[in-house]
Amino acid sequence: MHELSIAMSIVDMAQEEAERRKVHIDAVHLELGALSGVVKEALLFSYKVACDGTPLEGSRLVVKDVPIEVYCSVCKVPRRLASMQWFCCPDCGTQTPEVIHGKELVITALELKQ
């Protein structure tokens, strides 16, 4: 389960930033792409485990799901895919290997305790 090592890295990065700014963190906001290879539920569970005994204990991991978006070279516009099974434009059917969004695994914000 690589989600635990990812969660530990998230906690480490957030903790370093909290120490640098001398603040306490209430939540870590994350964008998680459908193609990231990370299971959201496993990451949420692992985050709680990784936070135990750290200054982030009790904080929340807020995950924003990022759908798969590809660029269609025929339609000349980005298209959102319903699933990752077929990388084809949903309008014209052209194969679309150019992924614009969906691979994300990015900390986007740290929510500070009041």
Predicted regions and their residues:
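Long, charged N-terminal interaction/targeting segments
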Residues: M1-S59
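Short loop/turn motifs enriched for small/polar and acidic residues
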Residues: E31-L35, K64-I68, L110
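Immediate flanking context of iron-sulfur cluster ligation sites
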Residues: V62-V66, V70, L81-A82
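Cys/His-enriched microdomains
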Residues: V70, F87, L105
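Short cysteine-rich clusters marking metal-coordination/redox-active sites
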Residues: C72-C75, C89-C92
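Cys/His-rich microdomains that often coordinate metals
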Residues: P78-R79, T96
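Short Cys/His-rich "knuckle" micro-motifs
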Residues: A82-Q85, V99-K103
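N-terminal loops that bind phosphate or other acidic moieties
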Residues: Q114
